[in-house]
């Protein structure tokens, strides 16, 4: 909870992330554009890099604890684990994106600056601090080697990752629309697995999303942790949820 609390409780979220990275001894750069700033931690830069991202900005009027100090905390824990390794050879950019809540501006600027031809795939960590289930929108990427083992079936099974076929849009969609394979990961309560799976099935079979589906979606507890909802407060969140996702990503990057 420490990282999540420092980010969610700060009036300078970007500055808090920079302070944490500096304290752990990570090398990072701040991408400064006219309309957004990103923070990038690069390991072994190449033209076949995997991007693991989380947006650092918050919805106006929200403290942005679950959306998305939790995802930023996941990235910080994984970076910390990699720094503790004597050797890490995979090419990975950990990117803290700005202005996701304004249409994924930070993700768009990052792709423009790096070049989509130099990005192999993208993992988006968004809303990772509530519930006891890991949900991953795989977008037909199970077993895709571009994800450096993170999408291996054995790893997904080991960490009990659920594949509902649908999660709400985030920065992953900016990469997907650019032709870059992408997945999104979050945590949620058990009922969310059912609701997201039902919506995912309808999308994949070209069935309409009904008003009843929308009501079921908006009634989920995890949805209420976002955008000024009933549970949009860090007191409702769990460090254990963040750890689940961080452990899955760390295991995939270091041990697969």
What feature does the model see in each segment?
Residues 23-31, 155-164:
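Short secondary-structure junctions
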Residues 40-42, 51-53, 93-96, 120-125, ...:
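Structural recognition of the beta-strand scaffold that forms the well-ordered cores
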Residues 126-129, 188-192:
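Glycine-rich beta-alpha junction loops
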Residues 194-256:
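His/Asp/Glu-rich mid-to-C-terminal helical/loop segments that flank catalytic regions of hydrolases
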């Amino acid at each position: 909870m420490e990282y999540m609390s420092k980010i969610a409780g700060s009036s300078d979220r970007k500055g808090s992330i920079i302070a944490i990275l500096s304290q752990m001894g990570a090398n990072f750069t701040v991408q400064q554009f006219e309309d957004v700033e990103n923070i990038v931690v690069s390991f072994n830069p190449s033209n076949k890099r995997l991007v693991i991202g989380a947006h650092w900005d918050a919805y106006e009027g929200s403290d942005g604890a679950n959306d998305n100090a939790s995802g930023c905390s996941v990235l910080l824990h994984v970076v910390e684990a990699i720094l503790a390794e004597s050797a890490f050879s995979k090419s990975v950019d950990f990117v803290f994106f700005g202005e996701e809540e304004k249409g994924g501006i930070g993700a768009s600027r990052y792709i423009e600056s790096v070049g989509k031809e130099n990005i192999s795939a993208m993992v988006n960590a968004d809303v990772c601090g509530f519930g006891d289930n890991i949900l991953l929108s795989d977008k037909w990427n199970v077993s895709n080697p571009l994800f450096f083992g993170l999408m291996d079936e054995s790893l997904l099974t080991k960490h009990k990752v659920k594949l509902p076929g649908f999660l709400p849009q985030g920065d992953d969609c900016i990469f997907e629309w650019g032709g870059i394979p992408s997945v999104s990961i979050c945590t949620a309560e058990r009922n969310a697995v059912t609701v997201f799976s039902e919506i995912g099935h309808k999308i994949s079979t070209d069935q309409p999303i009904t008003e009843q589906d929308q009501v079921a979606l908006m009634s989920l507890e995890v949805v209420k942790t976002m955008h000024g909802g009933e549970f949009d407060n860090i007191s409702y969140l769990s460090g254990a949820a963040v750890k689940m996702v961080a452990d899955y990503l760390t295991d995939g990057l270091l041990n697969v």
